[in-house]
């Protein structure tokens, strides 16, 4: 089946499915991605063995329900999709979902799993975090604060990496001054890669078995590799009890791109 046929078939199925559905304005995605106090969940799924045995026309119809669920919940949640297949051995797809209420994320995931497409998804992992105002930045030097405001390089950053982190009990027992000094060293090591590697931090303590979820986007995986090597050399790294497990690597995709990838 050609790409044009796939797009046409998906469009027809989706259009018919939403003929009588109300149109919602959609949540303010940029606000959710920049505000503090926003929940972020990472839902990782693998497709079951039955998926590959389905006829392409059936896969198209079931993938159209994915688009329908995303559209249904866009008023309350911001949803980003990533194709992991071929780059990560843990799963096939990743959903990063933001909302001001965690129950809105839960509602989306419940509807996703109960959809015709979702019935082929096996949950491979689920992580939850919360965005907060920078904890240590107020104690940084003025120059470092200014450096942190540098804009990232223009252009798409197609690769996404998700790395969960857990700190040791010793870290949480350190006094504030020592923590600030070590995080400032950590930040100094990361500054050379600030423009080519976008980073977002989620706080997970109490919401998950993690302390942090670190999310990265880049078009230069070699820079990300160098960034990780640099961060492993700073003093703060000795207090990291768990990093990765899993480490997720994928490609950013729109809903339509994801559908085209999975229908093949």
Role assignments for model-derived ranges:
Residues 9-19:
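Bacterial N-terminal signal peptides
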Residues 29-30, 79-85, 112-114, 149-151, ...:
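Catalytic micro-motifs at enzyme active sites that drive phosphoryl/nucleotidyl and oxygen chemistry
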Residues 17-27:
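Bacterial Sec-dependent signal peptides at the C-terminal "C-region" and cleavage site
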Residues 25-77, 100-105, 124-194, 205, ...:
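Short S/T/G/P-rich N-terminal loop/turn motif that feeds into the first structured element of a domain
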Residues 112-120, 232-240:
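A common structural junction motif
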Residues 62-64, 76-94, 195-200, 210, ...:
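A cross-kingdom feature marking solvent-exposed beta-strand/loop segments within repeated
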Residues 1-10:
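Bacterial N-terminal signal peptides that target proteins for export
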């Amino acid at each position: 089946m050609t790409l044009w046929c796939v797009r046409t078939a998906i469009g027809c199925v989706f259009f018919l499915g939403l003929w009588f559905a109300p149109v919602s304005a959609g949540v303010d995605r940029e606000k959710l991605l920049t505000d503090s106090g926003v929940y972020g969940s990472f839902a990782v799924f693998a497709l079951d063995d039955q998926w590959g045995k389905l006829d392409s026309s059936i896969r198209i119809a079931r993938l159209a329900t994915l688009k329908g669920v995303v559209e249904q919940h866009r008023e309350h949640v911001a949803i980003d999709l990533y194709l992991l297949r071929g780059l990560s051995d843990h799963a096939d797809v990743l959903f990063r979902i933001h909302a001001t209420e965690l129950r809105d994320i839960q509602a989306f995931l419940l509807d996703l799993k109960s959809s015709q497409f979702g019935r082929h998804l096996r949950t491979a992992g689920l992580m939850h975090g919360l965005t907060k105002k920078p904890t240590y930045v107020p104690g940084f030097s003025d120059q470092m604060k200014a450096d942190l405001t540098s804009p990232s390089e223009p252009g798409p950053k197609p690769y996404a990496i998700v790395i969960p982190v857990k700190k040791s009990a010793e870290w949480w027992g350190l006094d504030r001054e020592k923590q600030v000094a070590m995080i400032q060293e950590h930040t100094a090591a990361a500054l050379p890669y600030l423009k080519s590697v976008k980073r977002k931090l989620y706080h997970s303590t109490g919401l998950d078995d993690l302390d942090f979820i670190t999310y990265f986007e880049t078009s230069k995986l070699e820079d990300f590799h160098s960034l990780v090597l640099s961060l492993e050399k700073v003093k703060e790294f000795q207090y990291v009890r768990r990093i990765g497990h899993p480490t997720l690597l994928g490609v950013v995709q729109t809903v339509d791109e994801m559908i085209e990838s999975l229908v093949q």
